[in-house]
């Protein structure tokens, strides 16, 4: 196993060992009609659905962490996408983190995934279903070269291109985050059908999975959507800027103090956490 794969596994494992946040003390969805509240990186959810663990089209990883909750729209998206993938004979979709029962802030590994509208999906589609042991300790497949400038040709498969494209074409999806090298390969492979590329955004890490984000549901009145991605396919200067060396004097941004919770989320926390 190479160093990058080991690091990815360590990151998965480390998030479970950090101190719990108050949101992790809520072990069941909060009753009520489904409402995503706040922003993706500062919010919560009422009336979350549980993604069924058993499915012929997908498998859920790390069920011991209990991060398989989300807005009903997210559950339906996962079922819709995995059914499409299965019908095309592409393999089994591997589902990573969604959100916690009431959403909210994680103890590590994610800044977002707080409103029940985000899901991580591995960029591999096994033809043979994984065992319980494999699902509990998943082996991330790093698709990006060590220098970060391109995908590994022997690991990049047409099925992965199709998986990302199918997700991006879904009506409820607003963004998909992938590594810049993966976005670059999508740009090369896309041909003339390029409208969907607008939703695929380059971001740090994301070498072995895609992070799919849905738009705010119309009836979630306190949900804060992001602005739409810039027009175009995103394959030009913006993408190339990710491969340029840091400018002299560039320093890492200081870690910010988390902003106050939306009032509805604070009230939910006060009511359900002793």
Curated annotation (Swiss-Prot):
EC number: 3.4.24.-
Key word Disulfide bond present: yes
Membrane-spanning parts: none
Signal peptide span: 1-19
Cofactors that this protein relies on: Zn(2+)
Stretches the record annotates as Disordered: 227-274
SUPFAM superfamilies with a match to the protein in the record: Hedgehog/DD-peptidase
Pfam families recorded: Peptidase_M74
Keyword Metal-binding assigned: yes
Swiss-Prot/TrEMBL GO biological process terms: peptidoglycan metabolic process; proteolysis
Domain of life: Bacteria
Location relative to the cell: Periplasm
Enzyme class: hydrolase
Key words of the record: Disulfide bond, Hydrolase, Metal-binding, Metalloprotease, Periplasm, Protease, Signal, Zinc
Disulfide bonds: 44-265, 187-235, 216-223
Chief localisation class: periplasm
Matches recorded under InterPro entries: Hedgehog_sig/DD-Pept_Zn-bd_sf, Peptidase_M74
Binding site for Zn(2+) 1: 110, 113, 120, 211
SUBUNIT field: Dimer.
NCBIfam families xref list: PRK09429.1
Function comment: Murein endopeptidase that cleaves the D-alanyl-meso-2,6-diamino-pimelyl amide bond that connects peptidoglycan strands. Likely plays a role in the removal of murein from the sacculus.
Protein name, as recorded: Penicillin-insensitive murein endopeptidase
Organism: Escherichia coli (strain SE11)
């Amino acid at each position: 196993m190479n160093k990058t794969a080991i690091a990815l596994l360590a990151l998965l494992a480390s998030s479970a060992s950090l101190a719990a946040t108050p949101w992790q003390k809520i072990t069941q969805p909060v009753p009520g009609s489904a409402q995503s509240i706040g922003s993706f990186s500062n919010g919560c959810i009422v009336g979350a659905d549980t993604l069924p663990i058993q499915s012929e089209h997908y498998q859920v990883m790390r069920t011991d962490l209990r991060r398989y909750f989300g807005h009903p729209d997210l559950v339906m998206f996962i079922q819709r996408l995995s059914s499409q993938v299965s019908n095309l004979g592409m393999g089994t979709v591997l589902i990573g983190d969604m959100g916690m029962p009431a959403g909210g802030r994680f103890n590590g590994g994610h800044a977002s995934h707080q409103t029940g509208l985000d899901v991580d999906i591995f960029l591999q589609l096994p033809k043979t279903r994984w065992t319980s042991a494999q699902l509990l300790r998943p082996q991330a497949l790093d698709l990006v070269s060590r220098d970060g400038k391109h995908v590994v040709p022997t690991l990049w498969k047409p099925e992965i291109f199709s998986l990302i494209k199918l997700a991006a074409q879904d009506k409820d999806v607003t963004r998909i985050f992938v590594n810049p090298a993966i976005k670059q390969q999508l740009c090369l492979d896309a041909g003339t059908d390029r409208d969907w590329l607008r939703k695929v955004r380059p971001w740090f890490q994301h070498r072995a999975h895609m992070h799919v984000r849905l738009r705010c549901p119309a009836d979630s009145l306190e949900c804060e959507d992001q602005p739409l991605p810039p027009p175009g396919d995103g394959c030009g200067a913006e993408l190339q800027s990710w491969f340029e060396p840091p400018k002299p004097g560039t320093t890492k941004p200081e870690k910010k103090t988390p902003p106050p919770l939306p009032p509805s989320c604070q009230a939910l926390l006060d009511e359900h956490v002793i």
